[in-house]
């Protein structure tokens, strides 16, 4: 069997405690279930420094537990190196996209393709809204969007 090149994806949201760790965990489960996890480097990060060092929001952890998806992450902020080392940087909303495009312009070599994760949604829900000020059902909505988008992204990038 031919050796497959490793691809990499970084999921990004504002604080890296709600949406992006859910997307990261969902994508890890997808590539693990398809036995291609060794072909992917997967991580998540924040555009802001608000939550650095914190675990994912407990409501997101509960949601993932209900779906049987392991989730372990410590919030971190995106770095200049991330723009040079990841193939894809997928974010959740227009504000993230603006911040990432601005930050990428400060990097000499940006190899990452920066996109909205929602651009892969077959249901055309472009924005994955921040559930931080919401309730459990808002986290479930984020989870469902991430599942749809990550599946579609994996099919396209695979």
UniProtKB/Swiss-Prot annotation:
Protein keywords: Acetylation, Cytoplasm, Hydrolase, Phosphoprotein, Protein phosphatase
GO MF term list: acid phosphatase activity; non-membrane spanning protein tyrosine phosphatase activity; protein tyrosine phosphatase activity; SH3 domain binding
EC numbers for this chain: 3.1.3.48, 3.1.3.2
One GO cellular component term: cytoplasmic side of plasma membrane
Positions of modified residues (Phosphotyrosine): 132-133
Bilayer-crossing regions: none
Main location: cytoplasm
Organism domain of life: Eukaryota
GO terms under biological process: chemical synaptic transmission
Regulation: Inhibited by sulfhydryl reagents.
Phenotype when changing residue 132 to F: Reduced phosphorylation and activity
Active-site residues (renumbered): 13 (nucleophile), 19, 130 (proton donor)
Pfam families, per the entry: LMWPc
Enzyme class: hydrolase
Subcellular location(s) of the protein: Cytoplasm
Modified residue annotations for N-acetylalanine: 2
Function comment: Acts on tyrosine phosphorylated proteins, low-MW aryl phosphates and natural and synthetic acyl phosphates with differences in substrate specificity between isoform 1 and isoform 2.
Similarity comment text for this entry: Belongs to the low molecular weight phosphotyrosine protein phosphatase family.
Subunit structure and binding partners: Interacts with EPHA2; dephosphorylates EPHA2. Interacts with EPHB1.
Identification of the protein by name: Low molecular weight phosphotyrosine protein phosphatase
Native species: Homo sapiens (Human)
Gene: ACP1
